[in-house]
Amino acid sequence: MAIEAPVNFAPPERSTVVSTAGDSSTWQPSSLRMHVIRPKSAKGRKRPNLHRPQGMGDGSPSALSSSPPPRSSGSPSNQKPGVCATVSTSQGAPDEMPELLLQQAPTRTASSLNRYPVLPSINRRSLEVGAVDTVASKTSSLQLSSVQALYQEDSSQEDSRTQVCALEKKFIIRTKRQSSSRASNIEEPSDEEPRLLLAVRSPSGQRFVRYFRPSDDLQTVLEVAEQKNKATYQHCSIETMEVPRRRFSDLTKSLQECGILHKSVLGISQEEGEAWP
């Protein structure tokens, strides 16, 4: 019985022998009986052995499962790198096959997927500068408006103050004039002026005699009585002592309007309380 000897064929890219023009381009099987081990499949399982037919001889070429690839002419440096990568991936482990295939797959750039050209990027710094400028302008306008409002308010307050001061000055001047005129009226009239001799009785019972002008009002008579008696009379009225008696609560009327004659007696009556010392 003959011995089956396995035959290992070296890969064509590792061969250092340069083929000549006289070498045959096809591989010639030897006359010896050989058995070739088939390589593993892509799934990592061994393929079943081929059964030879009974009528086939030992040295027939059909006993061989497959013929080796043709030997390429030229040095290993002339061979393409893609062939080497394919051979190396076929010789690797089955588990590493997907990773190697993914690594060898050409990566498509993102620019090839875009249908339209990429727009230029917006300068963010210019936008920030524009925002800062707008904020600064708004702030300045707000400050200006607030300053104007304060100025208007201050001017209105000053105008109101000046108006109040003017009114106060007018009132003071008027009161001074009235006091001066009243002081002149309190003085007794001269002999050349028309005058009335009146006797005035205070609420406390004190009496005094004095000359008054017919144009003097009843308030002047009351003030002269306060000055003479050194007292203050409030809520007072003046009445005549002759019969029938007449009472005057409106002290703004003059003696001539009230019909008071020369050498009349007038009494000061206080409605509430007594005279204040």
From Swiss-Prot:
Q: Biased composition, Basic residues: where in the chain?
A: 35-50
Q: SUPFAM superfamilies attached here? A: Ubiquitin-like (SSF54236)
Name the keywords, alphabetized.
Cell projection, Cilium, Cilium biogenesis/degradation, Phosphoprotein
Biased composition regions of type Low complexity, renumbered to the chain: 60-77
Instruction: Report the principal subcellular site.
Output: other
Where is the segment annotated Disordered? 1-102
User: Which protein family is named in the record?
Assistant: Belongs to the UBXN10 family.
Q: What does the function comment of this entry state?
A: VCP/p97-binding protein required for ciliogenesis. Acts as a tethering factor that facilitates recruitment of VCP/p97 to the intraflagellar transport complex B (IFT-B) in cilia. UBX domain-containing proteins act as tethering factors for VCP/p97 and may specify substrate specificity of VCP/p97.
**Self-association or partners: how does it assemble?**
Interacts with CLUAP1; the interaction is direct and mediates interaction with the intraflagellar transport complex B (IFT-B). Interacts with VCP; the interaction is direct.
What is the protein name stated in its UniProt record? UBX domain-containing protein 10
What is the species of this protein? Mus musculus (Mouse)
